[in-house]
Amino acid sequence: MDKQETLYENGICAEELKNRLDNNENIILFDIRSKDEYESGHIPKSSFAVCNSQTQEQIMPKLPKDSLIVLINDDDQHSSKMVSFMKSAGLDAVYLKDGISSWKWELEKTQDEDITAENLKSKLDAKQNLFLMDVREPEEYSEWHITESINIPLSQVGKPDSLRKIPQNSEIVTICARGNRSKVAKFVLAGHGIHAESLEGGMKSWTVAFESAEKTYSINGKKITVVQVRRIGKGCMSYVISSQGKAMVVDPVFPYDEYVKIAKKNNWKITRVYDTHQHADHVSAAKSLAEKSGSILHLSAYEDYNFSHEPTYDSQEHKIGDMTLKVIHTPGHTNGSLSFLIEDELLLSGDTLFVDGVGRPDLRDEAEEFAPVLYDTIHKKLLTLSEHTRVFPAHGNTNQKDQLSSKMEDLIGKIPFLKMSKEDFVRQILSTVMPTPSNHKVIIDINKNGNISNGTEANLLEIGPNRCSIAGK
């Protein structure tokens, strides 16, 4: 077959394509021109697509084989070559002969946009009219998903029953693990005349995206600014706390540049970096951040670390600006867990006490030993603090502009664990079976040895939900 015959074999004329679209045939239109050209005018139901090696590796294998795929471009030879490649992968593909110039009917002018994790969280907080379609397989979805989403696997997205589930007048967001299947779902929906956005980077990006909330407290005549930095998807919370231009950072995660940016924006100098304990659910960035900022690295003296740091003991007091931090050894979640009390009013409780529950004692496989210790820590060290003490935990979720914290007196009223006898507390804790965080033993080893400084590698290990707390029942 010569080159001209191949072109003819791989092409479809505009009239035939129009007829098929009018008959609502199962067609996916990929406009592979530049984004500017696409947005200046494109065939209705078409999607902007990039044809490159990454697309061929990550997107093409997931395209439905029961749909006709039509490529739209102004270069017939390039389009024919791409169609031949797609056919070799088992896809039913053609290109529009003579490109967009052959289309005699009305064009649409819309922008091709996807949505970032930060923007999606902002819209969820504002309770905008969203329809979140998670296109992963059911077992992936059940493991971890955005609460407001529903599961429609990619193989079912274009089916009539699935299409009927999509409400009208909603902003539709497709979601998958890394943003590849969700792109395909977006293309399939476009073929049915339904506009959707794909979550950029999928649940991976949802895991690592940041948001922060800042509040200044006046305590004993001192101004103390607390910036709560939150991982949107995982719920990890860390803190940048400043006084008189000096700042401390507690429980930093990768990428640690976020804390550097916060300090720079406020003209603060980071002087101390802390971890409340040896984390099991995320890779600590404390060592890397301390090295980057030239700060003192404070780690629990009751846990083993195989790198240089300042061992931090119970009852020590540290000065940051004109505020005083008091160290409290609070074992139970881990044997070496620490909490930090600032000016006797603000408590950074790590994974020991949350606003809706308590830390889990089983991540070192010593739950029977640690559970009664956790009870004693809570009742003899934390609940003896002033009832007006404001608790800032290391995990939780809240609206974008709010800080998640609670006064001790309020926690006592709403967390049943805090009102139980020791016997009932231990029995309830030990009877609560929960899955462990992803790769938790690998993460513990990394945090013990400090043998990672690559945020990308760290984030790959951490994908998944918060599993360090036991909610009150």
Give the location of each predicted region.
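Core dinuclear metal-dependent hydrolase active-site scaffold
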Residues: A14, A117-E118, T225-V229, S238-S242, ...
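Accessory terminal helices/loops
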Residues: D2-K3, F187-V188, H192, E211-T216, ...
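Short, well-ordered beta-to-alpha junction loops that form the rim of enzyme active sites
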Residues: D31-R33, V135-R136, A177, P393-N397, ...
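Active-site environment of divalent metal-dependent phosphoester hydrolases
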Residues: E140, R181, Y256-D257, Q278-S284, ...
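Rhodanese-like catalytic fold shared by cysteine-dependent sulfurtransferases
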Residues: M1-I27, K35-F131, E137-E171, A177-Y239, ...
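Active-site HxH/HxHxD metal-binding segment of metal-dependent hydrolases
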Residues: F187, K234-G235, A247, F254-I328
